[in-house]
Amino acid sequence: MHEKTKLLNLTSDVIFKNFFMNENTIEYTAEFINLITGIPKEEIMKKAVFENIELPIINKNSKRYKCDIIIGIAKQLINLEMNASYYEGIIEKNNSYLFRMLGDRFNKGENYIDGKKIIQINIDNYKKYKGDKLLYRFTIKEDETLELETENYESYHISLPYLKEKCYNKEKLSRLQENNNELYQKIIALLIKFYYYYGSNY
């Protein structure tokens, strides 16, 4: 490993937020969002705005919702969540962020078709879903026809254990790169950059 290389613990709340919101790494953030969602990197670089992470409170008895990172772009709101460990209720907690943001998109008098698309990207430091994959995409579909109910929101889950297992085994990593498409390879390469960030910002 390069002597100036620092191994980042991205599951740390402070490092995760600092890294993704740091002006020195904004290009990585834009590339990351682009690879996951398909939103053009240039558009993200030009129009991205870091939003208030505390969602509006409806009344005094409402539960407070405080997200990790929210990035507003022209037609999308991106919610990045680092899930350092699994516990019962974590999926429901993150879904509550997503659906709360979905409901808060509109002001009085606004057209329902003009709201921003809500996209949640979860980086999971645990294995939860079947298939032994790096990236999982979730939407709401009809059971038999697989028709999308709406395109107004979607959520992604990235498996860090999957990445670690492949990266620490050169044979598996080589096979992984051979067997997966170009998009997968780019995501893997970018996540490796996140773990091995050159510089002294941290």
Residues of each region from the PLM?
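Elongated, amphipathic alpha-helical interaction scaffolds
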Residues: 1-202
